[in-house]
Curated annotation (Swiss-Prot):
Positions annotated with a glycan in the UniProt record: 209, 404, 460, 544, 556, 564, 589, 592
Topological domains, Cytoplasmic: 1-4
Organism expressing this protein natively: Homo sapiens (Human)
Alphabetically ordered keywords of this record: Disease variant, Glycoprotein, Intellectual disability, Membrane, Signal-anchor, Transferase, Transmembrane, Transmembrane helix
Catalytic-site annotation from UniProt: 290
Entry keyword annotation includes Iron-sulfur: no
The name this protein goes by in its record: Heparan-sulfate 6-O-sulfotransferase 2
Major place of residence: membrane
Stretches the record annotates as Disordered: 1-66, 530-605
Disease linkage: Paganini-Miozzo syndrome: An X-linked, syndromic, neurodevelopmental disorder characterized by intellectual disability, global developmental delay, severe myopia, and mild facial dysmorphism.
Length: 605
């Protein structure tokens, strides 16, 4: 049943009454309430909107109702706030029609109508503005109608010009592949983020001879398989910062889940519930606090596959990584850490299946901790594990009888420990240096083919750098850590040679790709040119012969075109290639480049 006409008119814009006719504002009472309820039961009708009525808190008077009522939902509130400024652009009659939509409480239809009318009003206003601008340009006496016509012609001309440019570009180079090649060939080179690192290490002179296998570190790490990265964390080497990078700053298909308030993150393989990282921030101290190389190599396999049968254990690849630091800075940083109350009592020091006895590893303090310890007392303790800590944690302690100092003479023991630490460090999948954060990031990315999200930051100010020591104390610290000093010198030389070798290999690969790209582009341009020339000659051979008496003209034009293209590409290549090895020329072949690098090391020596 339809709603009475008087009820429908109540929600329509008020009409001007005829002269002399009375204005009816209310419905007659002859319509029963049952009829109104039946009319309101039909969905989507105006009666349903009438029955629903306006929202809560809104008056029933039309002329006293605001333009937009405050809706109850946040999304509707945002829509209303976005549509409210458009009411000012509408005429009075259109505003009244908008109120009909508002009474139905259909914000979607209201916003669509407002946007449509608003854009039309803005276009009309812009049209008049352009007309006013043209009137100022072409003469003050021009009429508004003529200016509107000129503005329309200008817009039409701009659109036609754009379409003409698109057609010409498509005709000159119809393939998208050709367009991409031209954009890559003539675009400005992408800045190299490691250019400053190359310049800083330009004066580096190698001291050790390493083979190509020692310098080339590229691990085929299968994160979806069974491979595992094991992080050997040495105290006060920046391992905490690097460990956070591993769980929070790597681009992965399935990133690690790190929750607020939890010390460990969940680093699962894609599609599995197994971890690919064995570190403090992923598995915790599963092998003891700051476990060394001797502990990790015997503990990690049993921890990872301890619950499985030996016959069902997969053949895993354990990729060990670590971070080293300058021995003097690391020693001072550890002293400051101990001075604040650190003890590392939870360290197990398990070697050959057992922890050391109190006679083998005495303590330097008698209380609960060593807080407030002065530097002299810290250096005077002969059992301080801070002395030569990096060599001890990277070597195989079973070769020297673990912590039993009576197995062999001290001099022989030190030599065995140092050689073992060098060998383990060289055969590790990766190691970085705290003093070279950006190079550490680069080598890790190239080694494991995993990219970090944000670059590493080099901090020049640390707690150790704030400690002022004289030359005598510094020499004593170097004497207490003489094994670490030699190991760090070896590690720094190997680290910088690896960086230079990987950078040189990367530049050679980029140069080879540019040469292949240039050859492909030359062939494509020549093919397009000769095809167009052949089509023109086949269509009108007599006219082409009369217009082109010299057949070598097209060939000279093609040669000039290719010469200019080659020159521009060569200039771009020269801008991109960095200055390496004191400006010495390098070969394009990868194997030849490797031999050149090894040969340059011999010349530097």
């Amino acid at each position: 049943m339809a709603l009475p006409a008087c009820a429908v008119r109540e929600f329509e814009p008020p009409r001007q009454p005829e002269r002399g006719a009375p204005v009816r504002t209310t419905c007659p009472r002859r319509h029963s309430r049952v009829e109104a309820e039946l009319a309101a039961s039909r969905p989507g009708s105006v009666a349903a909107s009438v029955r629903a009525g306006p929202p809560r808190g809104v008056s029933h008077g039309f002329h006293t109702r605001p333009l937009l009522d405050k809706p109850r939902k946040a999304s509707s509130s945002l829509a209303g706030a976005a549509c409210a400024p458009l009411f000012a652009l509408l005429s009075r009659g259109r505003r009244r029609r908008m109120h009909v939509l508002r009474r139905r409480w259909d914000l979607g239809s209201l916003c669509r109508a407002l946007l449509t009318r608003g854009l039309a009003a803005l276009g009309h206003s812009l049209k008049h503005v352009l007309g006013a601008i043209f009137s100022k340009i072409f003469g003050p006496m021009a009429s508004v109608g003529n200016m509107d016509e000129k503005s329309n012609k200008l817009l039409l001309a701009l659109v036609m010009l754009f379409l003409f440019a698109v057609i010409v570009l498509q005709y000159v180079c119809p393939g998208t592949e050709c367009q991409l090649l031209r954009l890559q060939a003539f675009s400005s080179p992408v800045p190299d983020p490691y250019r400053s690192e190359d310049e800083s290490s330009a004066r580096f002179v190698p001291r050790y001879n390493f083979t190509r296998g020692d310098l080339l570190r590229k691990v085929d790490f299968d994160i979806k398989g069974d491979d595992l990265i094991v992080f050997l964390h040495i105290q006060k080497t920046g391992g905490t910062t690097f460990g956070r990078h591993l769980v929070r700053n790597i681009q992965l298909e399935q990133p690690c889940e790190c929750r607020v308030g939890q010390k460990k993150c969940t680093c699962h393989r894609p599609g599995k519930r197994e971890t690919w990282l064995f570190s403090r921030f992923s598995t915790g101290w599963s092998c003891g606090l700051h476990a060394d190389w001797t502990e990790l190599t015997s503990c990690v396999p049993s921890v990872v596959d301890g619950k499985r049968d030996a016959r069902l254990r997969p053949s895993r690849n354990f990729h060990y990584i670590t971070i080293l630091r300058d021995p003097v800075s690391r020693y001072l940083s550890e002293w400051r850490h101990v001075q604040r109350g650190a003890t590392w009592k939870a360290s197990l020091h398990v070697c050959d299946g057992r922890p050391p006895t109190s006679e083998e590893l005495p303590s330097c303090y008698t209380g609960d901790d060593w807080s407030g310890c002065p530097l002299k007392e810290f250096m005077d303790c002969p059992y301080n594990l801070a002395n030569n800590r990096q060599v001890r944690m990277l070597s195989d302690l079973t070769l020297v009888g673990c912590y039993n100092l009576s197995v062999m003479p001290e001099k022989q023991r030190n030599k065995v420990l140092l050689e073992s630490a060098k060998s383990n460090l060289k055969h590790m999948a990766f190691f970085g240096l705290t003093e070279f954060q950006r190079k550490t990031q680069y080598l890790f990315e190239k080694t494991f083919n995993m990219n970090f999200i944000s670059p590493f930051t080099q901090y020049n100010t640390t707690r150790a750098s704030s400690v002022e020591i004289n030359e005598e104390i510094q020499k004593r610290i170097e004497g207490l850590n003489f094994l670490d000093m030699e190991l760090y010198s070896y590690a720094k030389d190997l680290f910088l040679q690896r960086y230079q070798f990987m950078r040189q290999k990367e530049h050679q690969e980029a140069r080879r790709k540019r040469q292949e790209q240039r050859k492909f582009l030359k062939g494509r341009l020549l093919q397009t040119h000769f095809q167009s020339q052949g089509q023109g000659q086949s269509q009108n051979p007599n006219q082409n012969q009369s217009q082109n008496p010299n057949p070598n003209a097209n060939q000279n034009l093609t040669q000039n075109l290719m010469q200019n293209l080659t020159q521009s590409l060569s200039q771009k290549e020269n801008r991109e290639s960095p200055k390496q090895n004191s400006g010495k020329e390098q070969n394009d072949n990868t194997s030849n480049g490797t031999n050149d690098y090894i040969g340059s090391v011999e010349k530097w020596r």
